[in-house]
């Protein structure tokens, strides 16, 4: 028993040595997360402003209070770690953001369609444009209190209009 205790103590001391693995001075190998790429989820995104995100057949991005609408079913596809593409299943449009922070539906997949997905402390998700920033600040996907798309340049991570809950499609 004593021998095990001494071996455990010696292991702890050696693990804290300057060249031991796990310390900042040790070199790390490249990280690989292939299991997180290519994930596809069908969800409805419910905003903190009480609207479901939808893309209508004309490509207009907006909110709806009707929870059973077919145009609010979204395919959220992971393209890289933390980067997703949002596509409306019924209309086939991708949710995209232009350089001015305006949301629109795009028939083609472009770099404007990529969003950084982050799970916030309150359990909601935020989606920031991967390509566009305004004055160094990320531009977020958001719905205002009337269900309209809020300009990305006027949204921040802490705004409730940018917080979404992914709801399972039943």
Curated annotation (Swiss-Prot):
Keyword terms, alphabetized: Growth factor, Secreted, Signal
GO cellular component, as recorded: cell surface; cytoplasm; extracellular region; extracellular space; extrinsic component of postsynaptic density membrane; GABA-ergic synapse; glutamatergic synapse; Golgi apparatus
InterPro entries: Fibroblast_GF_fam (IPR002209), IL1/FGF (IPR008996)
The protein's name: Fibroblast growth factor 22
A GO MF term: growth factor activity
Signal sequence segment: 1-22
Keyword Lipid metabolism in annotation: no
Subunit structure: Interacts with FGFR1 and FGFR2. Interacts with FGFBP1.
Localization of this protein: Secreted
Gene that specifies this protein: FGF22
Function: Plays a role in the fasting response, glucose homeostasis, lipolysis and lipogenesis. Can stimulate cell proliferation (in vitro). May be involved in hair development.
Chief location category: secreted
